[in-house]
UniProtKB/Swiss-Prot annotation:
Sequence similarity: Belongs to the UPF0146 family.
Cross-referenced InterPro entries: SAM-dependent_MTases_sf, UPF0146
Protein name: UPF0146 protein MTH_1000
Organism: Methanothermobacter thermautotrophicus (strain ATCC 29096 / DSM 1053 / JCM 10044 / NBRC 100330 / Delta H)
Pfam families, sorted: UPF0146
């Protein structure tokens, strides 16, 4: 299941593409797989980093320089109260958003996200509207 999510993220991202995981915590299987099997510019964030390779950030009050230039933002099992913040940041930087919720949990966002079944996993995806600059 986790391999399938990582493969999907890799397929959506070319070499050098900036990808940000929000709420990395201690579960690093997906990020480790992405690092091992691709050349994306992967940044891990968490409000309470579990090690030095994770950048401290609170998605509800984000440091936007972390997310600028990101083509894809993803979060694995984020609490419902940050779903809308994830979407706001994705919109602000024009990034694709992937949320892998806990089983049975609803997505709580202002706009509808598409349910994607990929391999042995499922997740919700939102493609931000490109804003003119």
């Amino acid at each position: 299941m986790w391999n399938d999510l990582a493969v999907y993220i890799i397929r959506c991202s070319g070499p050098g593409t900036r990808v940000v995981e929000v709420g990395a915590g201690r579960f690093l299987y997906v990020s480790d797989y992405i690092r091992k099997h691709s050349k994306v510019d992967l940044v891990l964030t968490d409000i309470k980093p579990s090690h030095g390779g994770i950048v401290r950030d609170d998605i509800t009050s984000p440091r936007m320089e972390i997310y600028r230039g990101a083509a894809l933002i993803y979060s694995i099992r984020p609490p419902a109260e940050i779903h809308s913040s994830l979407m706001r940041v994705a919109d602000a930087v024009g990034a694709r958003l992937i949320i892998k919720p806990l089983t049975g949990e609803d997505i709580v966002t202002e706009r509808k996200m598409k349910l994607v079944n990929y391999g042995r996993t499922y997740f919700y995806e939102y493609i931000a509207e490109v804003r003119s600059r």
